[in-house]
Amino acid sequence: MPRTSMEILLFLGSAAMLGLGLLGIDYEPDEVQAELAQGPPPGVAGPGGGFGPGMFLAPVIVEEADADKDGRISPEEAGKAAAKFVRDADKAEKGSLEADALGRAVNRRMPRPPGFGPDEPSDEFGPGTFMAPAIVEAADADKDGRISPEEAAKAAEKFVRDADADKKGGLDSDGLAKAMNQRMGPPPGFGGPGGPGGKERKLVKDFDKDGDGRLNQAERRAARESLKKDKAAEGGRGRRGPGFGPPPGFGGRGEEPVKSGPRLAAGDVAAYPGKSLYDPSIVRTLFLEFEDGDWEAEMADFNRTDVEVPAVLTIDGRRLPGVGVHFRGMSSYFTVREGHKRSLNVSLDFVNLDQKFDGYKTLNLLNSHEDPSFLHTVLYSEIARTYLPAPKANFVRVVINGESWGLYGNVQQFDKKFLAENFGTEDGARWKVPGNPGADGGLRYLGEELGPYEERFELKSSKASARKNGDWKALIELCRVLDETPADTLEAALDPILDVDGALWFLALDIALVNGDGYWTRASDYSIYRDPRGKFHLVPHDMNEAFGPAMMFGPPGGRGGRGPGGPGFGPGGGPGGRPGGGPGGMGGGPRSSGIELDPLVGLDDERTPLRGKLLAVPALKARYLSHVRTIAEKSLDWKTLGPIVEGYRALIEKEIEADTRKLSSLAAFQKSVSEVDAPAPAPGAGGGPGRGRREMSLKAFADGRRRYLLENADVKKAAPPK
């Protein structure tokens, strides 16, 4: 079923459950979160993983949208409900809504989960922020970047009609719940950090009066005023206020009060002119100078637009003028308070196309969101690069307008320089698979039309070259081969077009290191490269959510869809799950410690055919399990990993202590890298919803995960590492 189904269900589900203008019922987010955290009632989850968001949403949707009260929701009823919501939300009476306006309308009626920001009402951040861009993208039939009542109605009608497999004229609660659980990825805020997907808003073309392709100070000022007027006209509150903090329980980070950092100048810090930009043994200092003092507010206003804020970058005494800066990230932006550290993207070639530092032209500076150890990204990168091409990573100190903003992760861009270093050529097609609420970028075959693939895969290389070389057609063919080729001939069919062993290493790392933002759970957040010979390669992208418990919802149906008692995460289908029910291992479930993630979880998840299809081939499954065993035996051995962690601790501990804008405490860092810590939870004991996720030290995770994998029956039978 096309991507539309998931987003429209989110649309209807949020409307029905959360008392929007469409419905008018009361909703307490903490009650629903508590229900989700407890898992399904005994006996509810059927084979194949019946537990999921639909279990809670569907009955309310049917009850509230069922106009004729026949116990079913028909396509017509769904369409009328969706159209009414868009019509009521169109405060500016423009006849349609863009994503920002739709998101704010949802947020005005949808209470944020506890801990997502200040107590006062706000429409600038909430579940609608995550849902709206994907809804508009999916339902926008005329591709004008907006959703009209008519488009909403047609999309909602199509979802219900397509999901009505028995052609009964509509869906009852059970049918709707089943369709939702089959088609929905993690619901916003539950299934792993994500964020508002959709396309960025294009402002440069409208405000670039001098035609130089970028906005100067006066042009940016005009654009900001226009943005504020648009939001006010559509019922918004302008630029968001004091910001939104992370939800409580995400690791007990002990966030410290923010205050200004020390003043630093180039003469106060060491320079490393002979060291690479990604040398792991140093902490280089980057100086950014913005022309305006309200640079943070300005970048917040331009978030999710095509506007770069210009600055001067100084590295090792070298002045690099005309760089462009914007905030990057989704949950790492939207759940971080203003004044605290947010991730940055710096384009060195913003004005001067030839400007680089050490051969690199893009900097990705990460705020270590949800990682009190600060080490997840650098460790994942170091381990992954042992087995396949992956971005390099190290640490830098960032000084903005003379004030230290502390320690950032510095992660290599997936660009031509990356290709040259890892594949010996700058040629070929590159795609980014961005995280999205639907988590549907896993190479599922969606037919021969290009549109659905362009929605899921963001081409980062030349469009002209992609057309000339047939790269999009080749990507569609890869998806088709995965989908339609029998297991006994799949390896031979894939070998000319996919680096199969590289894909198996990619999947093994994803699972062995429990990447909560990984392919296995989100079907997104990775990169794809097609080399000049026509072979595809998979490259890790988002690495900060590894080395810990899985997020609440992962692939439906657990391992092989065995349902209750399936080997996804311990007895009962979930870690410590109730007898007689359980999701069969939905991404580890809310109480999973993460160390018990089954290496064969989610093989029936249609969103992730690389796992389901490749591992259905006995020889490839055996090779994958051998790779998992290699990672467990070698890379997770604390005799190997411990000295690396200790080296980084010695390098950055003083930096973290001095960091006044960090998202976690010094004590949390010290606990994360401690050699002496509470042991990892015993098998089946779980870690408690939320907080246990980040209370496990790196050593406890490595020891526990290694032990679990090497004792796993399937892994034990795999060939040992060479």
Predicted regions: what is each one?
Residues 2-7, 21-47, 108-121, 181-205, ...:
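Phosphate/dinucleotide-binding and metal-coordinating scaffold of catalytic cores
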Residues 9-21:
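Bacterial N-terminal signal peptides
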Residues 39-64, 75-76, 80-84, 103-138, ...:
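EF-hand Ca2+-binding helix-loop-helix modules
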Residues 66-70, 92-94, 140-144, 166-168, ...:
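Acidic carboxylate motifs that coordinate Ca2+ or other divalent cations, activating on Asp/Glu
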Residues 69-75, 79-87, 95, 143-149, ...:
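Short, highly charged
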Residues 73, 97, 147, 171, ...:
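A broad, structural micro-motif
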Residues 76, 100, 150, 174, ...:
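Short capping micro-motif at the N-terminus of alpha-helices
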Residues 88, 94-115, 156-158, 162, ...:
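EF-hand and EF-hand-like Ca2+-sensor regions
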